[in-house]
Amino acid sequence: MAQRQPHSPNQTLISITNDTESSSVVSNDNTNKGRSGDNSPGIEALCAIYITYAVIISVGILGNAILIKVFFKTKSMQTVPNIFITSLAFGDLLLLLTCVPVDATHYLAEGWLFGRIGCKVLSFIRLTSVGVSVFTLTILSADRYKAVVKPLERQPSNAILKTCIKAGCVWIVSMIFALPEAIFSNVYSFRDPNKNVTFESCTSYPVSKKLLQEIHSLLCFLVFYIIPLSIISVYYSLIARTLYKSTLNIPTEEQGHARKQIESRKRIARTVLVLVALFALCWLPNHLLYLYHSFTSQTYVDPSAMHFIFTIFSRVLAFSNSCVNPFALYWLSKTFQKHFKAQLFCCKAEQPEPPVADTSLTTLAVMGRVPGTGNMQMSEISVTSFPGCSVKQAEDRV
């Protein structure tokens, strides 16, 4: 009797942009077409995998949908950083609704189920979503740097419109980067001479072309990981330096107000930094595994249990990045936490009245010309200021 081959998600290569990692056995010279291996995952392992995928999909859809709803239904949350964060949520939803369920089918079905068109469309969506995530975080870091360096700069009246255009440009750039993936992706078959087995996979290059594998994996690692995170690191180094200097140069008479302002800027910058760290942590194992397969002689399936576990771990961790952002915001932002609870339990968020103690009476000197005399006269008027009436609007609220 012929030996059956292991059915695993990495029968060929691991890729963040295509389904070479999801290729399945098409035929064996000594067995029926489409049969998988005796050492395939047991029923317990498959149940654990599917439960994990189901949790990622359901929790991710719920969290991102509530985040988007909070943004559109709450006027005070429609700020510059929140526009980028909402765009991030749309990208995550796209991945959760398409690519994650498709990836889950690879553990149950044998062979690529979605045809040549499905291969191209899903490869395009996957890379677009990854691009939206990392490029949005990059431009959001640049925005936070500008907010820290020029905290008192009044935003133009069309700041929201400009930010929406920037977010749209991120999507366009991501689609442009993903377009070659859609053009060249196809369902390829290749043969493992060691086990006399033919594999089928959705990939952006013929799997037998070793040089193309290496170029593809290296470009993905550079464009969608190393370069954006390097730019973000530069911005956050400058943010840290600016905040440190501003802390040292606070005048004594303005210390209370200035420290509150610095704390607010630090809180928003910290929120963005957490989102960046989550992206870097979640996607690193998948990138490393893809590079390992591309630059080593390990072209075909590695039957070891450790390799299978690490493959599952890297994929689950990468997909988990699409569901953790709303909960990171819930943990970091009391404002978002309040609105998140209100939307989750279908109740109205409380809008606290400003305390009387926060109002202040200010005396202003006004000089004007006395009618009929032509003489200048100075008068004093009293102005009561209330919270929220400062020159700088709440455009940085998260």
UniProtKB/Swiss-Prot annotation:
Transmembrane stretches, by residue range?
41-62, 82-102, 121-142, 163-183, 220-240, 272-292, 313-332
Q: Which residues lie on this side of the membrane: Extracellular?
A: 1-40, 103-120, 184-219, 293-312
Cellular component GO terms, alphabetically? plasma membrane
Q: Which InterPro entries match?
A: Bombesin_rcpt_3, Bombsn_rcpt-like, GPCR_Rhodpsn, GPCR_Rhodpsn_7TM
Keywords from the UniProt entry: Cell membrane, Disulfide bond, G-protein coupled receptor, Glycoprotein, Lipoprotein, Membrane, Palmitate, Receptor, Transducer, Transmembrane, Transmembrane helix
Glycan attachment points: N10, N18
S-palmitoyl cysteine lipid modification positions: C346
What the entry lists under SUPFAM superfamilies is as follows: Family A G protein-coupled receptor-like
| Segments on the Cytoplasmic face | 63-81, 143-162, 241-271, 333-398
Offer an example of a GO molecular function term for this protein.
Answer: neuropeptide receptor activity
Location(s), subcellular: Cell membrane
The subunit structure is: Interacts with C6orf89.
Query: According to its UniProt entry, what is the function of this protein?
Result: Role in sperm cell division, maturation, or function. This receptor mediates its action by association with G proteins that activate a phosphatidylinositol-calcium second messenger system.
Q: Which family does it belong to?
A: Belongs to the G-protein coupled receptor 1 family.
Name-wise, this protein is Bombesin receptor subtype-3
Organism encoding this protein:
Macaca mulatta (Rhesus macaque)
